[in-house]
């Protein structure tokens, strides 16, 4: 054997064994990620979907070979859709569980409460589902990083489309939450900028009876109705519209209606209902088709945008950790501030305050019992259908 061949074999032997030693040294080591999920309470459906997305990312990354040589472990607690409960749990994650990383809960109100805790400990928090711009107003510390389109911009594309179609009379109904308030304020601003008449602008409290509310709305004879609401209120709202035979040309909800539960509750009455969403299953969006296929195989239903958001948050956090090369809170914060990344969800890019500025919103419509992407035009062949209560 020549000296050259011997050196090559010896080097190969050293590389193989050193890699095995490195791998074996991480056996039993994990990176822990703490998060709450709304597994009960008013956000149960969306919160459950979101957690399924996060868990799917965890399974994928562990199958690929882990993160920084360690397996990823989720520590999950039910926050019962209550902001105060979530805030207490996140403090426990930091002080008692000593988690390495954090992902945010579901909803703007709960995230806002949690961010006050994570700010106190200078702990970076990637918000999975928080879009109310007021969360980022007057923040002194850039430790909260958004992934959603800001809610006050969510209705901009559909309102501009309605104005282009000469629809002028707009009604805006919204639930009493930080997220839906922001949607309503943004919708009113954009409508006024496009010379539309805001003929109805009224908040409602969560209720199973919208009859009196819808009666007042019906008197204004709107051509387009914008509704800022979560799933259960959205279902009851459509039922009340049908009962009073209110039939605008466009009926648009803020989200949470792209689920099988919405379709099951309303049957054919979902036809032509629009929803401004953060993500769509369109095959023209990178990774969307593969994710949808695998998610349905695993969960027996197609993913909602909340599920996609959960998965994408994992992708973004993974990218930031890999690029920083450590679990240092300071390094992670700096990386999340400067990161430009394209996830399953779209473009991630934040301003100096951590507010999302890189992502765009999509418009989905129920057509023939199926979810169809109808905007933006460059991503779909489907056209918007006018709404008609039957």
What positions do the PLM features span?
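Extracytosolic ligand-binding ectodomains
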Residues: 6-10, 21-390
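Positively charged n-region of N-terminal signal peptides that target proteins for export
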Residues: 1-5
């Amino acid at each position: 054997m020549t000296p050259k061949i011997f050196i090559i074999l010896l080097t190969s032997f050293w590389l193989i064994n050193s890699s095995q030693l490195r791998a074996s040294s991480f056996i039993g080591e994990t990176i822990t990620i703490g998060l709450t999920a709304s597994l009960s309470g008013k956000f149960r459906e969306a919160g459950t979907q979101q957690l399924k997305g996060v868990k799917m990312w965890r399974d994928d990354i562990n199958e690929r070979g882990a993160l920084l040589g360690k397996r990823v472990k989720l520590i999950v607690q039910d926050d019962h859709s209550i902001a105060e409960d979530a805030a207490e749990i996140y403090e426990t994650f930091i002080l008692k569980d000593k988690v390495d990383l954090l992902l945010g809960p579901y909803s703007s109100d709960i995230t806002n409460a949690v961010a006050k805790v994570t700010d106190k400990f200078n702990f970076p928090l990637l918000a999975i589902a928080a879009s109310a711009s007021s969360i980022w107003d007057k923040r002194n510390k850039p430790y909260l990083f958004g992934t959603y389109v800001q809610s006050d911009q969510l209705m901009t594309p559909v309102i501009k489309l309605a104005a282009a179609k000469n629809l002028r009379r707009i009604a805006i109904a919204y639930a009493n939450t930080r997220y839906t308030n922001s949607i309503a304020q943004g919708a009113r601003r954009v409508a006024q900028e496009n010379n539309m008449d805001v003929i109805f602008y009224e908040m409602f409290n969560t209720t199973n009876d919208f009859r009196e509310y819808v009666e007042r709305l019906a008197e204004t004879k709107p051509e387009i109705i914008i509704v800022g609401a979560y799933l259960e209120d959205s279902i009851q709202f459509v039922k009340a519209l049908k009962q009073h035979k209110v039939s605008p040309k466009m009926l648009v909800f803020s989200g949470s209606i792209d689920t099988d539960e919405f379709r099951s509750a309303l049957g054919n009455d979902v036809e032509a209902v629009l929803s401004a969403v953060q993500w769509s299953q369109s095959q023209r969006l990178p990774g969307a088709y593969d994710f949808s296929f695998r998610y349905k195989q695993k969960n027996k239903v197609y993913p909602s945008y909340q599920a996609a958001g959960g998965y994408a948050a994992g992708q973004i956090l993974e990218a930031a950790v890999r690029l920083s090369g450590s679990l240092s809170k300071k390094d992670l914060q700096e990386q999340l501030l400067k990161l430009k990344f394209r996830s399953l969800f779209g473009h991630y890019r934040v301003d100096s305050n951590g507010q999302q500025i890189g992502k765009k919103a999509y418009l989905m419509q129920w057509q023939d019992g199926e979810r169809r992407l109808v905007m933006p035009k460059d991503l779909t062949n489907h056209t918007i259908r006018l709404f008609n209560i039957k």
